[in-house]
Structure formats: structure tokens, C-alpha cells
Amino acid sequence: FLDELLNQIIPQVESSLPQPPTWRGIAGYSLAGLFALWSLWQTDAFDRAASASGSLWFPDFVDRASTAPFAGSPQAVYLSLGKKETKTPNRMMRHVLDDTRAMEALLVERGIPTTLELNPGNHFAQTDLRMARGIHWILTH
């Protein structure tokens, strides 16, 4: 999907703009939130990212990210998580808060303005509001 996004979708959208954008952002929820962050290590096409309830529990993602350089120079990253997301029978997913805090620390350590918002509810609570907050945050930072 990243290839299609970079080589088809973005060029088509940007060709309709009156001028090139000054920056690009990427945002996603759950696995798409993981994808948004992963993209920062794969391409320099995105300057800002929002990951709402990102699946940062994904095996070895945070560990690999901590030892790899970014493909570009991210300017800002928004992270959010539901306060009850750790209350799950899935053992891997129980660590999502620890993994998200580790990602926040990694980004801050690398000098990237980053925020982590903890929201009421579980993974499925207020998904539209949380995505809107993440997009608003990257638009204003």
C-alpha cells in the first residue's frame, strides 16, 4: 500500500492543488496507526504522523524502530490510546500502553515534538473523535 500511496495516490491528489504542499502528514487508527508510524522509517514523504490507538504491540516494532534511522526528518508525531486498551485477554495487546510510551520516549529522545493523549474507554471508544484530534494536532504543530 505504501508504494501505491507514494506513486499513485499522492501524485494524483497533489496534481490538483494550486501549489505543492509545504509538508505532508499521515494518520491512521489501530493497524493503520502502526502503518503511519512505520512509514516514517520507510520514506521521507511524510513530515508529520498521527497514530490513534496504534497497534504498537506488534512484535519487535518498537525495538526495531529504536535502532533504525528515519527515512526523513519527522517534524511532529501525535499518539493516543484508550485508557482501557490494556484490559484484554490477548497477552501481546496488554502491553500496548508500555509500547506506546516507549515509542513516545524514542521520538522525544530523537528531538521530535510528540504528544501522547490517553483517552477514556477502550480501543473502540470515540474512534472518530480521536482521529480528528490527531489530525488537528498534526495540522497545528
Model-derived regions: residue spans:
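Non-catalytic cap/lid and distal C-terminal segments of serine-dependent acyl enzymes
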Residues: F1-H141
